[in-house]
Amino acid sequence: MTIFAVFLLAIALSMDAFAVAVVSGCALQKPKVCHYVRLSAAFGFFQFAMPVIGWWLGVSVREYMEAWDHWIAFVLLGWIGGKMALSGLRALRNRESCACPSVDPTAGRNLVVLGVATSIDALAVGLSLAILGTPIWADAAIIGIVCAVITACGVYLGKTLANLCALNGWAELAGGLTLLAIACNILREHQVF
């Protein structure tokens, strides 16, 4: 696979991470450097690690993984999206102004769950690369680095949108609903409904 093809693949794999980063930046309103670093590093790491794991798993579990990957991503994104939406509704109900979300998408368990959920596709790519007999390390590194950069851009875009719209609790609600929509779209893409 050429470097250009790997780069395009990395961009495609980073789109879920970009969407989550925009939502996170919007919900946080004024993300700090630590938010950029944590989200970019986590998403970049998982986008690097998942193809490597998929490559090592190889063909032996491919059919099993393809049968369940969309359900895993759906549950993880749905869980975080639901928490964000409920937090946004609470902020709106309590008429909190300029409140940061009570659910920090860049910390703790939320960060790990989002990292895994946005990189499930990369696991399948690793399986595919194993079938093609492609060496994994350089490709996985490119995928991880591209995802980290795209994630940082997404957080910045989300911050800009939040500042322009002064969204407050609406941003967190919209972010949660967006994650729920992404989760449902994953099931739609796998023809569940």
UniProtKB/Swiss-Prot annotation:
The protein here is known as Putative manganese efflux pump MntP
Function of this protein?
Probably functions as a manganese efflux pump.
Similarity annotation = Belongs to the MntP (TC 9.B.29) family.
Which molecular function terms from Gene Ontology are attached?
Answer: manganese ion transmembrane transporter activity
Q: Does the keyword Ion transport apply?
A: yes
Point out the gene that encodes the protein.
mntP
The question of whether Nucleotidyltransferase is a record keyword is answered with no
A Pfam short name: Mntp
Q: Which domain of life is it from?
A: Bacteria
Annotated localization: Cell inner membrane
TM segments? 3-23, 41-61, 69-89, 107-127, 130-150, 164-184
Q: Which GO terms describe its cellular component?
A: plasma membrane
Keywords, A to Z, come to: Cell inner membrane, Cell membrane, Ion transport, Manganese, Membrane, Transmembrane, Transmembrane helix, Transport
How does the protein's chain sit in the membrane according to the entry?
Answer: Multi-pass membrane protein
Name the major location: membrane
